[in-house]
Structures are given as C-alpha cells and as structure tokens.
Amino acid sequence: MRKIIHVDMDCFFAAVEMRDNPALRDIPIAIGGSRERRGVISTANYPARKFGVRSAMPTGMALKLCPHLTLLPGRFDAYKEASNHIREIFSRYTSRIEPLSLDEAYLDVTDSVHCHGSATLIAQEIRQTIFSELQLTASAGVAPVKFLAKIASDMNKPNGQFVITPAEVPAFLQTLPLAKIPGVGKVSAAKLEAMGLRTCGDVQKCDLVILLKRFGKFGRILWERSQGIDERDVNSERLRKSVGVERTMAEDIHHWSECEAIIERLYPELERRLAKVKPDLLIARQGVKLKFDDFQQTTQEHVWPRLNKADLIATARKTWDERRGGRGVRLVGLHVTLLDPQMERQLVLGL
C-alpha cells in the first residue's frame, strides 16, 4: 500500500508578504492586479477571506466586499525563492516529488526510512521544518492514493493535517461529497445531483455503464475515485536547477564582520545540500543575496566552475560595499546554479 502526502501552503503568496512585512499580518490583504486594469485576485490572507475575498475573484468585486483591502501587486521572485526552499525540504525525505504549483506538491514516501517510515510523522516533520526555516505554515493530507491525499490536505486548514488510513477509506468515501473530488466542477456536480448522485457512496451503487453513457471517460474516473481507486503515480520532480541556503536575522546587521560571520556559518550547509545532488560540487554559477531593512533585496552572481567559499565572501563584500547604501541587512543568502545536463555532458566530452 502506498503512502502519499499532499502538502499545500497556507495562502502562500499572502503569507510570504506577511512574513516579510509584519505590519500586514492582521489586516486584510490580497495579491492581484488593479481594479483599473480589470485584474483578478491570486490569493488573499485569512482576514480578507472573512469578508468573502477569494482567489480568481475580480479585483473590483473584492474591493466592494472589503473596501479597506490592501492590494499588493505580488513579488514572484520572492514566492519562487520560498517555493524552491520548500522543495529542498521535501527532497530531504524523498526523491519522489510532484510539484503542482509553487505552493503545493505530492510526495510518495512509501519507501522512506525517515520517522520509522510513518507518513503521518513525516508530514508533521516537514510542516514543522517549513515553519522553522521559512516562518510559513503548511497543511498536509496523508492517504494511500493521490486524490484522497489532496482532499485530506484541505480538511484541517490552516496549519494542520489530516490522515486517511487504508482501513478508513471505505467509511470516508461513503459520505464524501462528489464536489470534493478534484475535477468535479459546479456543472458536473449539478448534473450528478440531477441523477440523485451527491456522494461517493451514491456513485458506488450506480451502474458504471450509466456513468459512461452520461459522462464518457470522466464517468469511469468518477466511478474509480468513488471506489477509492487512483493508480496515478507521483511523477518525480524535474531536475533541480539550483541549491541555496539563507538566514533571516532576528535583528538587522550593520557591519561587514557580522555578514562575513553569517556566511561562514551558512557555507557548510550549502556545501552539504549541494553534495546531496552534486557530489563533485561542479556548478554553473554561484552568488549571494542580501535583503535590506526596507525589504529591497539584491542578488549578485557570476560564472564559477566549483563551489568556492572565498569567492562567495568576495562577492558578498563587493555587494555589501556597492549596494547597501548604509541600510541594515536583515537576510543573507548563498546559492548556486547547477550545470545544465547537456552542458555537463559537453564538458565531460571535452575532457
């Protein structure tokens, strides 16, 4: 029996904004395009959701529901950065990772030896690690198949998890509304209800032939899901493109010696993480990131063939001297970009 975890970050874009600017934490905020440009909401925090603001809602409607809504344009580099860090955390537990978007993924931990092989404990530890390292919360679902893991991750949001053991699947399905199954939209749900089908238990009693005539291929999928059948594998994560490590300080730093000391502490962790995916430590580029007390950030990198601490320190010093402008620094990060597989093959052939 497989052990599948679905991890879903809680209002991810908004959560990153609130983490980086605590003044936003207790007020309604949303990420989206402006009303003038007929934008839509990407996500909203929980204070905004209390007013009915939702993802994919037109910005104009959101502002009518919540006139004091703080609308943010979004910082997708920051979201991508956090997403990459989260996926790196996943990789500590399994190589079988299927990202669905920046803020959610499936993990197959069937063969994982972590936490004595307990998927429940692995999910809990992953969520704790995400919060410890990124100050972001995640929800998780654990089940023997993918669609149930995804449904389960929504059961105890935010910052919770829900487990459906193999023994619990039949009872869980009996009362599960069909609208909860991924892929069943409002139109399909209405058609099913017109047939007297509201739950998976109802579909279990329905003849498959009827479902096939009414819904075609989707009818079979619906019938299988209602039986708890989902044979889809977790598709492994695409080849990793970068590895990074960073630290947000409790208090801003103002002296180069403090920054250098942080790099000295970060470097061994970067080396450890890189060695897990590239034991030879060969890379395409390496660089540093500084985030300042006004939440602006700068990244500087250049081509370098192998992870090198002295070069990272020199790059950081140059960045510190040229771009800080007297500002305090709240975050220091180190990262490397991995060689493209085709480029790596060419280098090997060249040798």
UniProtKB/Swiss-Prot annotation:
GO terms for molecular function: damaged DNA binding; DNA-directed DNA polymerase activity; magnesium ion binding. Its EC number is 2.7.7.7. InterPro entries: DNA/RNA_pol_sf, DNA_pol_Y-fam_lit_finger_sf, DNA_pol_Y-fam_little_finger, DNA_polymerase-Y, DNApol_IV, IMS_HHH_1, Rev_trsase/Diguanyl_cyclase, UmuC. One of its GO terms (cellular component) is cytosol. The keyword Protease does not apply. Signal peptide: none annotated. It is found in: Cytoplasm. Mg(2+) binds at residues 8, 103. Binds 2 magnesium ions per subunit. The record marks 13 as: Substrate discrimination. It catalyses: DNA(n) + a 2'-deoxyribonucleoside 5'-triphosphate = DNA(n+1) + diphosphate. The active site is at residue 104. Residues 4-185 form the UmuC domain. It is an enzyme of class 2 (transferase). GO terms for biological process: DNA-templated DNA replication; error-prone translesion synthesis; SOS response. Keywords: Cytoplasm, DNA damage, DNA repair, DNA replication, DNA-binding, DNA-directed DNA polymerase, Magnesium, Metal-binding, Mutator protein, Nucleotidyltransferase, Transferase. Its cofactor is Mg(2+). NCBIfam families: PRK02406.1. Poorly processive, error-prone DNA polymerase involved in untargeted mutagenesis. Copies undamaged DNA at stalled replication forks, which arise in vivo from mismatched or misaligned primer ends. These misaligned primers can be extended by PolIV. Exhibits no 3'-5' exonuclease (proofreading) activity. May be involved in translesional synthesis, in conjunction with the beta clamp from PolIII. Monomer. HAMAP family: DNApol_IV. Belongs to the DNA polymerase type-Y family. This is DNA polymerase IV.
